[in-house]
Amino acid sequence: MAKSDVIEVDGKIIEALPNATFRVELENGHIILCHIAGKMRMHYIKILPGDKVKLELTPYSLDKGRITYRYK
């Protein structure tokens, strides 16, 4: 899948789940499950409930995503 196929949206972490999975509320009110991108795991970037994040969704499955950035 090419990088241009992803949909980038912003959201807010609602709940931290096991295995670096999070429940995220999007700006439009939808709630989806997201996991942390590999580079964020490598650099030990911590994500807590209440953080604002950028995430990627694929056009094939809009109920799961990948967190790619945590806003400061």
UniProtKB/Swiss-Prot annotation:
One Pfam family in the UniProt entry: eIF-1a
Entry GO MF terms: ribosome binding; rRNA binding; translation initiation factor activity
Any one of the GO CC terms: cytosol
CDD domains, per database record: S1_IF1
Keyword Secreted in annotation: no
Location of the protein in the cell: Cytoplasm
Major place of residence: cytoplasm
InterPro entries: NA-bd_OB-fold, RNA-binding_domain_S1_IF1, S1_domain, TIF_IF1
Family matches, as SUPFAM superfamilies: Nucleic acid-binding proteins
Superkingdom of the organism of origin: Bacteria
PANTHER family per the UniProt record, alphabetical: TRANSLATION INITIATION FACTOR IF-1, CHLOROPLASTIC
The protein's role, per its UniProt record: One of the essential components for the initiation of protein synthesis. Stabilizes the binding of IF-2 and IF-3 on the 30S subunit to which N-formylmethionyl-tRNA(fMet) subsequently binds. Helps modulate mRNA selection, yielding the 30S pre-initiation complex (PIC). Upon addition of the 50S ribosomal subunit IF-1, IF-2 and IF-3 are released leaving the mature 70S translation initiation complex.
Subunit description: Component of the 30S ribosomal translation pre-initiation complex which assembles on the 30S ribosome in the order IF-2 and IF-3, IF-1 and N-formylmethionyl-tRNA(fMet); mRNA recruitment can occur at any time during PIC assembly.
Family according to the record: Belongs to the IF-1 family.
Protein name: Translation initiation factor IF-1
Organism lineage: Bacteria, Pseudomonadati, Campylobacterota, Epsilonproteobacteria, Campylobacterales
Gene designation: infA
